[in-house]
Amino acid sequence: MYINYLKDLIGFKSVTPKSDGAIEYINDLLKQHGFKTEIKIFGDSKSEQVTNLYAVFGSNEPNICFVGHVDVVLAGNHELWHNASPFKVSQQDGKIYGRGAVDMKGAIACFLAASLDFIKNNTDFKGSISFLLTSDEEGKAKHGTKEMLQYIYDQGYKINFAIVGEPTCEKEIGDAIKIGRRGSVNFKLNIEGLSGHVAYPHKANNPLPCLIIILNELTNIKLDEGTEFFQRSNLEVTNIEVSNNTSNVIPASTEASFNIRFNNLHSAETLAKQVEEIIKQHCKEYKVDYKLEYSSSAESFIQNPSDKIKEFAKVVEHTLKIKPEFSTSGGTSDARFVKNYCPLVEFGLLSETAHKINEYTKISDLQKLYDVYYNFLMEIL
């Protein structure tokens, strides 16, 4: 059934933060199979409204929750997709093409099939199975999983263990389980000089040489050596702007944006202090003014592998005959919110085609993921 579920889910044009009926489809399906469901819509305005779902079968512990998102990123040029449509499924050579196939409608389809089959085959299991789904993970993530977790806990629900269905595997299904994530902090630096004629530089103060020196130092600084589970923290310049299209004018100001992905040796605040010390030093030397802004959407985190995390890894190894590596690579995810409530793993399909034109998953990979999810429910419940 996971193939049918995936085909149906791909058909919903659920570009962030819209559900476009995807969450309603899952809600109806789970309700038909005895789940207690609730859809909540959060958001400050109509354009920001986010659709969320919590569905649970059973009332006993442990409550094993699948956490995921139905929203997808923009599909780009539709003409470049199979069937010229990212939201119309194309099945070729054992693969299913469509936006969201791996990120992450494929994982949702597999856990739907696994949980419904498990409930059908095990009428007296000891715990509960639940879903927490949102239509805003790829965007601001303000009114999605974070807000929904707080809501369900206020209602008296408790999650004992979560599986976040992000596409975590690198080369084959089962080679990686994420137990943490790097943090992310964005910076915007504005440097104010004094404009003037290029022939009279002594009557002006060009902010660009100062910016170049600063960015050169920042991009070459070694923030750390990494840790057992984390790679080195990394800074990337993402944008440089100079509002000057005239070749004989020294610009008055310039602006640069950069991002740091960081491990658990840092926080956004400590990095901001380190960055500002470098900026302050050079701006003083060049006698220019600066303004530095920063914002962090996620701090880094790492979990010590709990018994349930180890049990999940054993199920992966037993099912797929591959020993998974505990990993923290990749971008941010909603796991950063879930970890405040319960132990978790992130485990899903291959990440190779996520967000790309002609995103696809192999049907054989869907079967492997279904098997892992089903076997874990058998083992833990």
From Swiss-Prot:
Question: For binding Zn(2+) 2, which residues are annotated in this chain's numbering?
Answer: D103, E138, H355
Query: Which PROSITE patterns does the record match to this protein?
Result: ARGE_DAPE_CPG2_2
What cofactors does the UniProt entry give for this protein? Zn(2+); Co(2+)
Its UniProt pathway annotation is: Amino-acid biosynthesis; L-lysine biosynthesis via DAP pathway; LL-2,6-diaminopimelate from (S)-tetrahydrodipicolinate (succinylase route): step 3/3
Instruction: Tell me which UniProt keywords the record has, alphabetically.
Output: Amino-acid biosynthesis, Cobalt, Diaminopimelate biosynthesis, Hydrolase, Lysine biosynthesis, Metal-binding, Zinc
Q: What class of enzyme is it?
A: hydrolase
Q: Offer an example of a GO molecular function term for this protein.
A: acetylornithine deacetylase activity
Reactions catalysed, semicolon-separated, are:
N-succinyl-(2S,6S)-2,6-diaminopimelate + H2O = (2S,6S)-2,6-diaminopimelate + succinate
- Give the UniProt record's GO annotations in the biological process aspect: diaminopimelate biosynthetic process; L-arginine biosynthetic process; lysine biosynthetic process via diaminopimelate
Binding of Zn(2+) 1: at which residues?
A: H69, D103, E166
Active site positions: D71, E137 (proton acceptor)
EC number assigned by the record: 3.5.1.18
Tell me any Pfam family this protein matches. Answer: M20_dimer
InterPro entries, A to Z? ArgE/DapE_CS, Bact_exopeptidase_dim_dom, DapE_proteobac, Peptidase_M20, Peptidase_M20_dimer, Peptidase_M20A
Q: How is the cofactor bound?
A: Binds 2 Zn(2+) or Co(2+) ions per subunit.
Q: Which CDD domains match?
A: M20_DapE_proteobac
Q: Which PANTHER family match?
A: ACETYLORNITHINE DEACETYLASE (PTHR43808), N-ACETYL-L-CITRULLINE DEACETYLASE (PTHR43808:SF31)
Record HAMAP family: DapE
Q: What does this protein do?
A: Catalyzes the hydrolysis of N-succinyl-L,L-diaminopimelic acid (SDAP), forming succinate and LL-2,6-diaminopimelate (DAP), an intermediate involved in the bacterial biosynthesis of lysine and meso-diaminopimelic acid, an essential component of bacterial cell walls.
Describe the protein's quaternary organization and the partners it interacts with. Answer: Homodimer.
Family in the record: Belongs to the peptidase M20A family. DapE subfamily.
- Name of this chain's protein: Succinyl-diaminopimelate desuccinylase
The organism's lineage is: Bacteria, Pseudomonadati, Pseudomonadota, Alphaproteobacteria, Rickettsiales
